[in-house]
Design a protein with these regions (language model features):
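N-terminal pre-Walker A segment at the start of P-loop NTPase domains
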Residues: 1-16, 138-141
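Post-Walker A alpha-helix
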Residues: 38-40
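Conserved glycine(s) of the Walker
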Residues: 33-35
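Structural recognition of the conserved hydrophobic beta-strand(s) that form the central parallel beta-sheet
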Residues: 87-89, 108-119
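Acidic, divalent-metal-binding catalytic cores of TOPRIM
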Residues: 92-93, 127-336
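Hydrophobic anchor at the beta1->P-loop junction of P-loop NTPases
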Residues: 27
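Post-Walker A helix-loop "phosphate-sensing" segment adjacent to the P-loop in P-loop NTPases
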Residues: 44-55
Length: 336
């Protein structure tokens, strides 16, 4: 299953309108923010159609699983579904189990979790965690609910960074070491170890770089760690992935690259790629060749030439560019 899917769910008083872009989406928020109302409306529509007083307009097949059935297990109810967007509420404990995790990764369906807790065994994007926001629309004469991204991909930096910690221990680490040549750089050796690394390290003024496409399950913990250790001055940057940066910077080029980057959801088959991070790695490994052949385990000289480093720098956020520029100025000053 791949693609972007639009939903418009409404009755006489309420309207929910949103898009689902990836195979795993979270809608979070406190009680009484509309999450359960949305699920109940969609569930009632599935049971009774427009006779329920509810309309669902969408280009997707969908299923709503509210609670454990008295007569069937989740496997019996969901196991045979394909190419379907499955909405699941948070009271279902089975979503924490390894067999359900396997189902999410291999079934070829999309999943929308109405869930306040992270699912640590699933790789999902920082940008696909939402909260519902609402306002009254005079045009619609309804209370209108839309999705708002919950977490930023870049937090404010005061300009001082003494340590950069990246989850990558291979090509990404080597590349960033070349770019930020006046700042100490280290690896946390995977996204599962980012939090413990930050909690235990004594350094201050730390920039943490993570692959946002698969870091959603840890982002709340990362923000909590930043807040719990204010004297460490921890900030973070969560681009989709290192390979995404290389592709966006056009360090390599091939037909349809622009279309793929603009509408990635149309190209990522979730039964083949559980996250966009893996898809971008696949592109780099299969679309590069010769001197530009990409190796995730060790950066090749092609990608750390001045020309390609500058290409990548141009697509960095401004505050990250300034860090790298400070490194260049420092290096130049040391030559004289």
């Amino acid at each position: 299953m791949k693609g972007k899917y639009h939903f418009k769910v409404y009755n006489k008083k309420l309207l929910f309108e949103f898009d689902i872009n990836r195979n795993i989406t979270f809608i979070q928020g406190n009680s009484a923010t509309g999450k359960t109302t949305l699920l109940n409306m969609m569930y009632d529509y599935l049971l009774s159609g427009r006779g329920s007083g509810i309309t669902v307009e969408t280009n997707a097949k969908f299923m709503v699983y509210l609670r454990k059935s008295l007569t069937a297990t989740w496997k019996q109810e969901l196991g045979n579904l394909t190419d379907t967007i499955i909405f699941i509420e948070e009271n279902n404990r089975f979503i924490q189990r390894s067999d359900f995790t396997k189902f999410v990764k291999e079934s070829g369906n999309y999943f929308v979790f109405i869930n306040r807790k992270a699912l640590k065994m699933l790789p999902y994007s920082v940008t696909e965690i939402y909260r519902l926001q609402n306002e009254y629309s005079e045009e619609e004469k309804k209370q209108v609910y839309t999705l708002q991204q919950r977490y930023p991909t870049l937090t404010y930096m005061n300009g001082n960074v003494n340590l950069i910690a990246t989850e990558d221990s291979n090509s990404g680490l080597e590349f960033f070491s070349k770019v930020f040549n006046n700042i100490e750089i280290t690896s946390t050796y995977g996204n599962t170890k980012v939090i413990s690394f930050l909690e235990n390290i004594e350094n201050t003024d730390i920039l943490c770089i993570v692959d946002g496409a698969a870091f959603g399950c840890f982002i709340k913990d990362l923000i909590s760690t930043c807040n719990q250790h204010p004297t460490k001055h921890i900030t973070y940057w969560a681009p989709e992935s290192f390979e995404f940066l290389l592709l966006t910077a056009k360090t390599i080029n091939f037909p349809e690259l622009d279309k793929i980057l603009k509408d990635t959801y149309n190209y990522v088959d979730c039964i083949k790629f559980v996250s966009w991070e893996r898809f971008y790695t696949f592109l780099m490994e299969t679309k590069s060749n010769g001197q530009a052949a990409y190796d995730k385990h060790s950066i090749t000289q092609f990608y750390i030439t001045e020309e390609n480093i500058n290409k990548v720098l141009k697509i960095f956020p401004k505050s990250i560019q300034l860090l790298a520029q400070a490194g260049k100025e420092y290096k130049t000053m040391n030559l004289f």
